[in-house]
Amino acid sequence: MSSTRLEDIAKKLEGAKLPDVDFDAYYQTQTSDNDKIKRVVDYFNELDHYLEHGEEVKGAKLPFSKTHNLFRFRQGEVTLWTGYNGHKKSMMLGFCAIEFLKVKEKVCIASFEMKPIKTIIRMARQYTHSSECSYETVADFMQFAASDLYVFDHQGNLNASRLYAVIYYSAKELGVKHFIIDSLMRVIAGEDKYNEQKDFVVQLCNLAIELDIHIHLVHHTKKGKENEPSNRYDAKGSGAISDNVHNSLIVWSNKDKEPEKPDVILKCDKQREGEWEGSIALSFDASTMRFNEMFSERSGA
């Protein structure tokens, strides 16, 4: 296939280019508490819905059916994604982002360790089940995600206050519902900056609540024995990181190809608003970079 179709899609979206934004100035004009003081009657519709329907299971789903009644990415929460270096945390999160896009929940990815084109190509292959990147693959993905997927194009370290402003703008002006930060170490450099790490995560929780979005925070695990999944307390830096987030998900890959264990284990070891904590076994297709549920006895979970 030639580049014609890709060019056609790009031309259609030409008018949707974002304006230049001074994020810091924008943030300063938006952080007012005036609209937080409300009358009790303002909650009538919400109360009426609750009384009629009760507590509903809400939130975006993982792309694995066995978790749909067990875990959700609820708005107003922060999920910590951890795992050993090279165990496919970012790849898994991109795969999940495709699921969010399928239900028209807008996503913004701030990957400070990977250029946007690499992220787009990887997600395009996952979405199209393709073992290679082609014009057709990218065009199909662009048509699917063009209006709902954003990237914050910055590699390297970034000041925390600047990131807060970007998150605020993405949610308020673009309607983003999932903001992905990859990773914490590019915002708070230094494993021993415990107070800064705590303050950063607390502020992310505050923003998630205020903006009614879900924030996904990727973080690295301390070096250790990689033949078993880690837990949230193995995350580098302050224990306040895992203490303050709402959910903790851990991605572990079977690097040694042990036959009795699955290719990948996705482990939930914290869910503040849900009862389930546990693991699910997944197979991994390296050619398409897709993860699939395993229903055999070789679960390892």
Indicate where each model-derived feature is located.
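The Walker A/P-loop phosphate-binding site
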Residues: 27-129
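Conserved inter-motif catalytic segment of the P-loop NTP-binding fold
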Residues: 3-12, 16-24, 58, 103-192, ...
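Hydrophobic/aromatic beta-strand patches that form the interior of the parallel beta-sheet core
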Residues: 79-81, 108-110, 150-152, 216, ...
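Charged helix-capping and loop-helix junction motifs
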Residues: 194-203, 231-235
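Cofactor-binding loop segments of dinucleotide-utilizing enzymes, especially the Rossmann-like FAD-
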Residues: 112, 220, 253
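Core recognition of P-loop NTPase motor domains used across DNA-transaction enzymes
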Residues: 1-75, 143-146, 205-210, 279, ...
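Structural recognition of the conserved hydrophobic beta-strand(s) that form the central parallel beta-sheet
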Residues: 180-181, 213-220
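C-terminal regions of RecA-like/P-loop NTPase motor modules
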Residues: 6-11, 23-26, 37-39, 164, ...
